[in-house]
Amino acid sequence: MIALIQRVTHASVRVGDEVTGEIGPGLLVLLGVEKDDDEQKANRLCERVLGYRIFSDEQGKMNLNVQQAGGSVLVVSQFTLPADTEKGLRPSFSRGAPPEQAQALYDYFVSRCRAAGMTTETGRFAADMQVSLTNDGPVTFWLQI
């Protein structure tokens, strides 16, 4: 399971004319699900995302996690993250989980964020979405379990 996390001052996702999720300061989480992923991996990744200390403390050091910084989370499904890009000029998506498994684990990941007390907004699984964000820093990390 892969999370590309970005520290943002604002982020939103829309499907057509509908805004399905919007946050102020916090984390935009692009979430990719691989074939061998399960709830245990989703739990570990959620703990890591929410605990990752990438927000500045009073001294300007990256020392606070999103909860300590008072932020929110916007989770967007991203089936291209597990792509195999090692050869050729076209990505292969054979590493990605089938849609039913991916959606179940995406929904589970979101539920774990909410259960941890995080204000959590989402995109719409498998929809064509437009994501807008203001990356703060920029600060972007690739987390993989």
From Swiss-Prot:
This is D-aminoacyl-tRNA deacylase. A Gly-cisPro motif from one monomer fits into the active site of the other monomer to allow specific chiral rejection of L-amino acids. The lineage of its organism: Bacteria, Pseudomonadati, Pseudomonadota, Gammaproteobacteria, Enterobacterales. It comes from Cronobacter sakazakii (strain ATCC BAA-894) (Enterobacter sakazakii). The gene is dtd. Keywords: Cytoplasm, Hydrolase, RNA-binding, tRNA-binding. It holds the Pfam family Tyr_Deacylase. InterPro entries: Daa-tRNA_deacyls_DTD, DTD-like_sf. One of its GO terms (cellular component) is cytoplasm. GO terms for biological process: D-amino acid catabolic process.
